[in-house]
């Protein structure tokens, strides 16, 4: 079976023996702690999310929170932000025990959180989103829109944010929405600011801007909790960090006292010797050929070939048109001109259904908005792409076989969940991503398009997904992989296609590809 062959290929790279770093302590004086968590536990049906953890944040510091997906980071932050109620333990603010009765209570007590999944109202303006429920009123009790604009403009000037306060949020890019979320959190003048993967959709320039804001807040004495999977960010912005693993507190250290390998060992409980396990496999015949592909006003004249067993990386800055090309290939946004050939034969792809009939699969970059059915369980999410194909005979769904294959896929991908009937919204981001990958692998694709396959995923899960992608290529699947992470592009690709402002600026062979050359092509 397809999944069994892939599983054997992945298993051939066995994990090395576990090692650990002794947990440390920041040694923060009690009077210096703006926020402290003691012995907090939280369980969900079939899952212990937090097991008696501790955590401290000092004034005027950036405290990074590290751990694999499912380690308990987001659960702890939701408890601190008043979204969840802990089953046990206590929370102290400025040394005083408190009970948080919801997110508004947490805000009133000086705790603001920027969620990884943005929570803005799309049909309201930027200013209205920032000051919602706090709008200035005129003498008639109506919203004072002039004062609303003035407050927003003053806030943006302080944070050096160049966004029109009158713009509807729905018209903004994901990166701009992220900056609005950050400004909204800052507007509460909270003592504690929690940032959950704040750079996931930002360009390098925008990340630099965000770090300037964070340093400014740190100088004002704010305590900042910074959740990230990116090691370079930890060393650049964090004063200290804590690691969680499988719902347990592992330790706290000063960022200057450890190496990248130390942190990885703390996070995963083992060594990860090969982050980019690219197999050398025979490259087969051309499966997908694209010539002069265009979507008016978005990108133009994109041409390339993709062969069986090949991983073609796609690099470029945010806004370069990478994701738009993927959407055109899969029929999400039909191309306005150009030619697509599969196995040398011209094909017309104007809908995802047509793309799937030609053996294509597409993992989108935004798993929340266009990937997951959040209110449905794992089984429903995993089977969504195959119900009309392999498992329907004589107009009846072969439920037993489908469930067996979904269970096998879940085991192969090491999805951490109580079972197939758990709602996918209760899973960590990394496990949600694995479910979506499993959805498309069940279709047995010949051409697999991956758009940011490891965004927001911890280092251990990244290595697993890299092994999976390499194993798929080894079985002859043609892979088109879009990524904003340069090490991932360079480490996994046989060739790298580079885009800039809607144009393809070059294709570089693996042996000739390096960061300088790719960035040069990406900025032409």
Swiss-Prot record:
Residue ranges occupied by any ABC transporter domain in the UniProt entry: 35-271, 281-520
InterPro entries: AAA+_ATPase, ABC_carbohydrate_import_ATPase, ABC_transporter-like_ATP-bd, ABC_transporter-like_CS, P-loop_NTPase
Highest rank taxon of the organism: Bacteria
Membrane topology, from the record: Peripheral membrane protein
Compartment(s) where it occurs, according to its Swiss-Prot or TrEMBL record: Cell inner membrane
Main location: membrane
Enzyme class of the recorded protein, top EC level: translocase
Family membership: Belongs to the ABC transporter superfamily. Carbohydrate importer 2 (CUT2) (TC 3.A.1.2) family.
Record protein name field: Putative ribose/galactose/methyl galactoside import ATP-binding protein 1
């Amino acid at each position: 079976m397809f999944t069994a062959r892939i599983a054997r290929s992945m298993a051939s790279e066995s994990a090395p023996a576990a090692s650990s770093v002794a947990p440390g302590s920041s040694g923060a004086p009690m009077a210096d702690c703006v926020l402290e968590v003691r012995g907090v536990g939280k369980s969900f049906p079939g899952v212990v999310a937090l097991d008696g953890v501790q955590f401290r944040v000092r004034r005027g510091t950036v405290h990074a929170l590290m751990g694999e997906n499912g380690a308990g980071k987001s659960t702890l932050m939701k408890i601190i932000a008043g979204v969840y109620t802990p089953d046990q333990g206590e929370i102290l603010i400025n040394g005083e025990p408190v009970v948080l009765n919801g997110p508004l209570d947490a805000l009133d007590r000086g705790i603001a959180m920027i969620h990884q999944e943005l929570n803005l109202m799309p049909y309201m303006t930027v200013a209205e989103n920032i000051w919602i429920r706090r709008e200035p009123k005129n003498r008639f009790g109506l919203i004072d829109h002039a004062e609303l604009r003035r407050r927003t403009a003053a806030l943006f000037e302080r944070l050096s944010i160049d966004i029109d306060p009158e713009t509807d949020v729905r018209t903004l890019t994901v990166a701009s929405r992220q900056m609005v979320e950050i400004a909204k959190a800052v507007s509460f003048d909270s003592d504690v600011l929690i940032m959950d993967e704040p750079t996931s959709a930002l360009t390098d320039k925008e990340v630099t801007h965000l770090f300037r804001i964070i340093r400014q807040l740190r100088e004002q004495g704010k305590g900042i909790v910074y959740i990230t999977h990116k090691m370079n960010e930890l060393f650049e912005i964090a004063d200290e960090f804590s690691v969680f693993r499988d719902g347990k507190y592992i330790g706290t250290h000063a960022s200057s006292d450890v190496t990248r390998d130390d942190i990885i060992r703390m996070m995963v409980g083992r060594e990860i010797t090969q982050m980019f396990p690219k197999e050398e496999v025979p490259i087969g015949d051309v499966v997908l050929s694209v010539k002069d592909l265009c979507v008016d006003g978005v990108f133009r004249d994109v041409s390339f070939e993709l062969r069986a067993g090949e991983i073609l990386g796609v690099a470029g800055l945010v806004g370069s048109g990478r994701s738009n090309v993927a959407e055109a290939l899969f029929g999400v946004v039909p191309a306005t001109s150009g030619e697509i050939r599969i196995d040398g034969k011209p094909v017309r792809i104007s809908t995802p259904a047509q793309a799937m009939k030609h053996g294509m699969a597409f993992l989108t970059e935004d798993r929340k908005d266009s990937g997951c059915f959040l209110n449905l369980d794992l089984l429903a999410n995993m089977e969504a792409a195959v119900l009309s194909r392999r498992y329907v005979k004589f107009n009846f769904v072969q439920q037993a076989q489908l469930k067996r294959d979904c269970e096998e896929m879940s085991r192969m991908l090491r999805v951490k969940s109580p079972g197939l009937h758990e709602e996918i919204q209760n899973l960590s981001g990394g496990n949600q991503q694995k479910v979506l990958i499993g959805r498309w692998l069940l279709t047995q694709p010949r051409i697999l398009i991956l758009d940011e396959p490891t965004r927001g995923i911890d280092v251990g899960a990244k290595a697993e997904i890299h092994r999976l992608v390499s194993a798929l290529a080894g079985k002859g699947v043609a892979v088109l992989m879009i990524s904003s992470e340069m090490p991932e592009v360079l480490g996994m690709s046989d060739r790298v296609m580079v885009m800039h402002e809607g144009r393809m600026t070059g294709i570089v062979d693996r042996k000739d590809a390096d960061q300088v050359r790719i960035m040069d092509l990406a900025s032409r």
